[in-house]
Amino acid sequence: MNRIVTLLLATLVGLPAMDAGAQSSHKYPPIEEYLMARDAEIKLARSAAPAGISDRATIKVLTKSGFEVAQQGDNGNVCLVMRGFSAPTYTPAQFRDIVHDPTIHAPICFTAPAARTALPYYEMRTNLALAGKSPDQIAEALQAAYATGKLPRREAMTVAYMWSAHQHLGSGIDAWHPHMMLFAPYYENSMVGGNAFGSVLPQVSDDAGTPFTVVVVPVDDKLAVRMQ
C-alpha cells in the first residue's frame, strides 16, 4: 500500500500478482471511490499509532486535490490514510498498478523526521495519480523531483507506524500485522537478513536500492490499535 504504501505489505503475505498489462490499460476509477467521510477518515488515521504518537499529531485527509490538514497537531507527527496511490515507484513491478484500487485504506503515522523527508514523496505520488498520471509517468516525475531537489533528500533512516487494526491493504488481505515502516534509503534486502520474498520479516517491501526503499518490521499483534 508507497510503501503503501506501502501497501505492498500485501506482497509479503502472498497477494496474487496483478496482471500489469491489463491494469495499466485502465483509467483510474472516479476519485469519489477513493474518498471517505471526513470524520471517519480522521478516526482511522489516528488508529495508525499509539495515543502517545497520534493524539497530538497533525491529521490529514484526502480530498479531490490531494491531502489537506483536517486537524493541526503540535508534536511534529503526521497521520493520514494512504490509498493505493502510495504503491511502489519501481519494485516490485507487479504492484505498481495498485494505484487503480480504490478500496485500499492504509492508516499511517509519520514521526516528525519522516514527516519532513518521506511524507512529501507520498503526497506527490498522490497528486500525480489524482492528475491521471500512469505508474510510469509517476516514476519519471518522482525521479526528476528527487534529482532536482523538489523532494527532500533521504540521507538517514526514518520511521512511521502502521499499527491500525483496521487496515485494508488489498483484496483478501484486510488488516495485516501491525508494523513499522522504515524509510531506509538505498537498502537492499540482503542488508536486513536476505529473507526470501513471502517468508519471514523483516524484508525490503518497496523500491530496493533506491532513495525510496521501505523496510517492513512487524510488531506483536496485541499492539494493534483500534479506533476510538
Q: In which residue ranges do the predicted regions lie?
A:
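Bacterial N-terminal signal peptides that target proteins for export
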Residues: 1-8
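N-terminal signal peptide c-region/cleavage motif recognized by signal peptidases
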Residues: 14-19
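Primary mode marks residue(s) on the alpha4-beta5-alpha5 output face of response regulator receiver
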Residues: 24-228
